[in-house]
Amino acid sequence: MAMNRVLLVTLLSASSAFAQETNDPFPEPISAMDGVIQVDFTEFALVPDIDGQPARMMLLSDEPGTGRLFVNDMRGPLYSIDYDGQTVTQYLDIDDADWGVSVQSSRNELGFQSFAFHPEFNRSGAGGFGKFYTWTDSRNTAPDPDFVPGGGDDTHDTVLLEWTARNPSAGTYDGDVPRELLRVEQPYGNHNGGQIGFNPTASSGDADFGLLYIGIADGGSGGDPLNLSQNLNSAFGKIFRIDPLGSNSTNGSYGIPADNPFANDGDDNTLSEIYAFGVRNPQRFAWDPDNGNMFLADIGQNIVEELSLVTSGANLGWNTWEGSFQFISRSGVSLSNPRGDAAVTYPVAEYGQEDPLLQRSSAATGLHVYRSDAIPELANLVLFGDNPSGEVFYVQADGLPSGGQDAIRRVLLDDSGDGKTLLQVIQEKNTEQGRSPAGRADLRFGSGPDGQVFLLNKRDGVIRLLVSSRGSR
C-alpha cells in the first residue's frame, strides 16, 4: 500500500509539472489592428543578383566620413551605395580567392554575417584610419581557433578580420589581405556568428569609443546541448567587447578593455572578452541615440522571441530561461515562477512563436531606435520585427515595458492605401520580377544618415526606405 502511495504522489507531481509546460505562454495575441502605424516606403536601391538568385542582404550601415551606405551579401560581396540610392558599386568581395577567406555560405544561416567600419575610418592619422571589420563563416579551419566549443561536429570556423584601405574614399577596396583578429570553431552548422558593431553614441574620449561589440551565438543544434551560454569560460552565447587596435588578448591580436565586467575579476575561468552572456542567437543589436541604451533582438528556441536591454555583465538567461520563462525543452517552457531569478536580465518585450500573425518559424530581428522627426509616426519608438513573416513591430522607447507582448504593436507598409507586411510587398515584387512569390521575408533593418530606416530582405534584392505617410489608426 505504501508503494501505491509513493506511485500516486510521483504521478501527481509529474502531472503537475507537465501542466505547467506550454508552447504558448502568452494568452492574448498581438493585436492585428490596435495601435497600428502605417508608413510609406520607397524602393531606394536594388542590389545585384548572384547566379540569378536575389542578394542575401544581412546588414546596411552608414559610413558618414565618406558619405556612403554599405550593404553586404552573405555570399561575400560588400557594396557601397550613394546616399541617393542611384549607384550601387561592389566595394569588395571577401570571397575572392585573393583574400583566402573562403566564405562558407552553403546554408541559409551561414556566410558573411556582419561588418563594421571603425569610427576613425576616415580620420587621417588616427589608429582606426581606413580600418573596417568583417565577421564571417569560413570553410578554412586554419590557423588553429582561439575559441573551441569542446564538442560538436567542428563544421567550420567563424572569423573576425580587419581590413585596411589605403584610401577610405576610393570606390573599391585598395588595401592588402586582411589581418585575422580571432577565430571561433563552430560545433554545428547554425547559430554561429551574429552582428558586430561600434557604439555610435560614443565620442572620441569616451570609454566606449572604438570598442567593437561581437555577437556570438550558442553554437547551434538546439537547446544549447553543450551548455555553453551560461559557461563564462566559453565564447558561445556571448556578446564580446574588444579593442581591435589593442594587443593584450591571449593571441596578441586585439585588446581587452579594462572595464569589461570580467577583465579584472582574478578568475582564470572567465573570459575577459565577455560583455554579456546567456544569449542564444544575437543577430541584431542597436543603441538608443538619446540615452545610449543598448538593445538586442535575440532569437528564441521554439517558444519565445526576445527584445532585451544589454548592460555590462548582464546574464540574459539562455539556456536556463527562454524569455521570461524557464526553459524546459525544445517543445515547451514552464509557466511556474516567471522572471523568478533576480540575477537574470529579462526581456523588455517578447512574443510567442505561436502568435497568429506569424509563421511557425519565427525569429526576432531588427533593430532601430527611432529618435528622428522625419517620420513623425515613428518618433520615440524601438523598431524590431519578425524575420520570416516580415512583420515590423514597435514598443515605446520611453517608459519601456517589463516583458510580455501586450505593449507590442505593428507597423504596416502603405501600398496605395493598403497596409501590408514586408512579405506581402516582396511577393508582389517577385511577381513583377518573374520570380515565384517568396514564402518568407528574411527581414533585416538598416540605418542611414539622420536616422533613416531601411528594410532589407533576401528575396527580391530591393532595399526599401521608410518615409512618412501620416497614415495611422
Which role does the model predict for each range below?
Residues 151-161, 227-247, 308-330, 472:
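Predominantly five- to eight-bladed beta-propeller fold
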Residues 2-10:
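Sec-dependent signal peptide recognition
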Residues 294-301, 309-375, 379, 385-387, ...:
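Extracellular protease catalytic domains of secreted zymogens
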Residues 14-16:
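N-terminal signal peptide c-region/cleavage motif recognized by signal peptidases
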Residues 82, 250-252, 308-309, 315-331, ...:
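Extended hydrophobic/aromatic segments used for targeting, binding, or gating
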Residues 28-52, 86-106, 163-187, 208, ...:
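Blade-edge beta-strand/turn elements of extracellular beta-propeller
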